[in-house]
């Protein structure tokens, strides 16, 4: 009797663990995607600033 209840509790725990792991993985992927987007935005800003500086250097006031 105790063995069957033990196995069911273990299977329930493993199912919960799998759900938690999947949730953590999805959150990790979302955070990585947001970081990549932030880095890409920073790179585009830096590129635009570099172009502006180049134009300003080519055409000084």
From Swiss-Prot:
What are the protein's UniProt keywords?
Glycoprotein, Host cell membrane, Host endoplasmic reticulum, Host membrane, Host-virus interaction, Membrane, Transmembrane, Transmembrane helix, Viral immunoevasion
Instruction: List where in the cell it is found.
Output: Host endoplasmic reticulum membrane; Host cell membrane
Query: Could you tell me which residue ranges are on the Cytoplasmic side of the membrane?
Result: 36-61
According to the UniProt record, one GO cellular component term is:
host cell plasma membrane
Q: Which residues lie on this side of the membrane: Lumenal?
A: 1-14
Q: What topology in the membrane does the UniProt record assign?
A: Single-pass membrane protein
Q: Major location, coarse class? A: host cell
What's the superkingdom here? Viruses
Q: What does this protein do?
A: Prevents infected cell apoptosis induced by the host immune system. May act by down-regulating host TRAIL receptors. May act in complex with E3 RID alpha and beta. May play a role on cellular apoptosis regulation in the ER.
The UniProt entry's sequence similarity note says: Belongs to the adenoviridae E3-CR1 family.
Q: What is this protein called?
A: Early 3 Conserved Region 1-alpha protein
């Amino acid at each position: 009797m105790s063995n069957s209840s033990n196995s069911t509790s273990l299977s329930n725990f493993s199912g919960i663990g799998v759900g938690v792991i999947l949730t953590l993985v999805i959150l990790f992927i979302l955070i990585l995607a947001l970081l990549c987007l932030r880095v890409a935005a920073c790179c585009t800003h830096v590129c635009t600033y570099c172009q502006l500086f180049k134009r300003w250097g080519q055409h000084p006031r």
